[in-house]
């Protein structure tokens, strides 16, 4: 069999299992109401939790940044691409999210995937042991693999099982790695226990707050701030393309940790820096997130979450007990989940079907993602539409 035929057979196998993923084309800015593939829809697919992706203040900051700095950075951060906009943003991120450390410093990355790879591959290596939650994001899984450390997977959210594994480990370097808000279930890690275990066992605790930053905690400062947690063992990763409404990610930790990443993190060193205009837009986003407007958006989002939980509990399917903007409705089979997604789409509602390997086999689901840009009328549309596709998919 030739190489192309091998791929064609692989794609046929994906189709047979109902697992092919397809992109949709947005013709308008990200928001609750969009034009997608030429059709008007209400979107419940994005991670734009605060509805900032098309905020005029961010758009203008992006445009002004491009006028000042041009369209690209021109190089890596260590070879000419580190602008004043990047430096200013890192100072702002350290001040905003670094309350857990006595000497916080931040490092900006082009993507969350790169930030997670940087933290794990630079802090761990051969001879180290990484303890990773069973439901961690793919970027944390890949970072652990690429680090060449020994990797132990502990049961999801099970701090007691993690404690037992840490007690049995004599590796000189240990890392506990966990999402804060888990992206497919919407539940929150036992962060206070994880911090205590990290300090008890002399381990780093790397937390990925992709779905908590901007939403949780006072002024949206994130999951650690929401729980009032502080520790020199913490390494905090935040994402800027979700609630912040722009792009990129960052790591905040003690200044010594960040300097180590600058010197050793390959996904920071060997890539072109993001355009400075992106950093300008993120700075504007931080100002909105921390403002009274940000508080109002978080309050509205909280009310939407409460209403959605009530809607999903009224269905005969299995809602996951989530108190966050990620509201999954577990259906089970790939085929039934795809049918439900298609029926919702026919009624102008974009609710994506999540299937393996993103979630375990037999737990395919609709992932309803809420935004402060949604209205209660949008939820009423969703509630009315759920009855038909869910019944048809049964």
Curated annotation (Swiss-Prot):
Name under which the protein is recorded: 8-amino-7-oxononanoate synthase
Family of the protein in this entry: Belongs to the class-II pyridoxal-phosphate-dependent aminotransferase family. BioF subfamily.
Enzyme class: transferase
Source organism (scientific name): Burkholderia mallei (strain ATCC 23344)
Keywords: Biotin biosynthesis, Pyridoxal phosphate, Transferase
Biological role stated in the UniProt entry: Catalyzes the decarboxylative condensation of pimeloyl-[acyl-carrier protein] and L-alanine to produce 8-amino-7-oxononanoate (AON), [acyl-carrier protein], and carbon dioxide.
Names of required cofactors: pyridoxal 5'-phosphate
Pathway in which this enzyme or protein is active: Cofactor biosynthesis; biotin biosynthesis
Quaternary structure note: Homodimer.
Catalyzed reactions per annotation: 6-carboxyhexanoyl-[ACP] + L-alanine + H(+) = (8S)-8-amino-7-oxononanoate + holo-[ACP] + CO2
A single GO molecular function term of this UniProt record: 8-amino-7-oxononanoate synthase activity
PANTHER family attached to this UniProt entry: 8-AMINO-7-OXONONANOATE SYNTHASE, CLASS II AMINOTRANSFERASE/8-AMINO-7-OXONONANOATE SYNTHASE
Sites where the protein binds substrate: 21, 137, 358
EC number: 2.3.1.47
Positions annotated to bind pyridoxal 5'-phosphate: 112-113, 183, 211, 239
Keyword Transferase listed: yes
GO aspect biological process, one term: biotin biosynthetic process
SUPFAM superfamilies to which the protein is assigned, alphabetical: PLP-dependent transferases
